Amino acid sequence: MTTTAVPPTSTQLCGVFADIDAAVAAAHKAFLAFSDCSLAQRRIFINAVREVASQQERLEYMATAAVEETGMGNAHHKVLKNLYAATRTPGVEDLVMEARQGDDGLTTLEYSPYGVIGAITPTTNPTETIICNTVGMLAAGNTVVFSPHPRARHLSAWLVDVLNRAMVEAGAPDNLITVITEPTPDTTKALITHPDITMLVATGGPQIVNMVLSSGKKAIGAGSGNPPAVVDETADVAKAASDIVQGASFDNNLPCTAEKEVIVVAEVLPQLMTAMTANGAQVVSDPEELAKLRSLLLDTSGTRPNT
């Protein structure tokens, strides 16, 4: 796979700012203008995001650049992740009005935006998260300030610029999404506590998720996952083996939703092991090989990735 997409030649990237205050101020100004846009206009802007983010050359560039900058993942798999984020994230079609009729008349219930959302994105899914958040949050009428993982900051700034340009070309206000150029723990704290940030969304590890959930603001946190796959005597063992191997190997097992361990009843263990091996899994039981794998994959504490 080659990086065929060319980053913008302009020295001024759209929506990219040097500090949190400037990024929030721009997103807040954009929110005021965005509030005057109709649902039909929102759909147009979001369709522009979907289109520009799902072009093959950009999919390949984002996937390859993410692996290069973060040092993590499988570029071929990231192409699919970005494509699905662009094409399958729900948009304005999910904003369904409810109507209730009774003796006192008709009541309608409609969703309203929170305002400016502070969104913290991870190193494991840097572009996928920005695309997904942009579609979903803008569909609801919000604007977004992104705080990317430091090891994905260059690609994140590039993507925010690309998406903003596509939306502006479709008639959107400037800076519907913004990002800072040099994210740090201090800038993340400043984003969380900023008075003009009305909602927080964090995709990352337990520490950052706990920070937003204890911020006192409306917050959604998606932290690290450790999903088990349970296989018992009622399972379709061949299908279970195929699904587990495919899920656990997808994007080098970076997604928090991917299978991380298998719990299996003794009765079907031999059959499952054979089927998993047939699907490309490898059995490693030699202590020396296990030690080498641990040192390759984990840091000296044995509790964190060796990045």
Where are the regions that the model predicts?
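N-proximal accessory regions
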Residues: 85-91, 161, 175, 290-291
